[in-house]
Amino acid sequence: MARIAGVNIPDNKHAVISLTYIFGVGKTTAQKLCDATGVKPDAKVKDLSDEQLEALRTEVGKFTVEGDLRREVQMNIKRLKDLGCFRGLRHRHGLPVRGQRTKTNARTRKGPRKPIRK
């Protein structure tokens, strides 16, 4: 297994699909990475040369991925909570943030139903 950005990417899959195993790299970004490094998107990772893998590593290094991206997202949420703005309050209370209805749906965000006490 090749290791890029601290992630073991599968050898037996195409390069584009394997790159999406990295947090922060989707299909479009993976395609751009392959184009920038000259790697054929349909080439298997096990068939790539060491130079191509190294080129992919340096190109991925230019993006914010994995731990840095996770930390950045968490810091953004923490900033909203500290500001006390509406979105921060929704995060703090564990409710949907982007205006979804909560009367009937939002079970994932709200958690399991609580029984009615008498």
Swiss-Prot record:
GO terms for molecular function: rRNA binding; structural constituent of ribosome; tRNA binding. One of its GO terms (biological process) is translation. Gene3D superfamilies: 1.10.8.50, 30s ribosomal protein s13, domain 2 (4.10.910.10). Transmembrane segments: none annotated. GO terms for cellular component: cytosol; small ribosomal subunit. The keyword rRNA-binding applies. It holds the Pfam family Ribosomal_S13. The keyword rRNA-binding applies. Keywords: Ribonucleoprotein, Ribosomal protein, RNA-binding, rRNA-binding, tRNA-binding. InterPro entries: Rbsml_uS13_C, Ribosomal_uS13, Ribosomal_uS13-like_H2TH, Ribosomal_uS13_bac-type, Ribosomal_uS13_CS. Residues 94-118 are annotated as: Disordered. Belongs to the universal ribosomal protein uS13 family. Located at the top of the head of the 30S subunit, it contacts several helices of the 16S rRNA. In the 70S ribosome it contacts the 23S rRNA (bridge B1a) and protein L5 of the 50S subunit (bridge B1b), connecting the 2 subunits; these bridges are implicated in subunit movement. Contacts the tRNAs in the A and P-sites. Part of the 30S ribosomal subunit. Forms a loose heterodimer with protein S19. Forms two bridges to the 50S subunit in the 70S ribosome. This is Small ribosomal subunit protein uS13. It comes from Marinobacter nauticus (strain ATCC 700491 / DSM 11845 / VT8). The gene is rpsM.
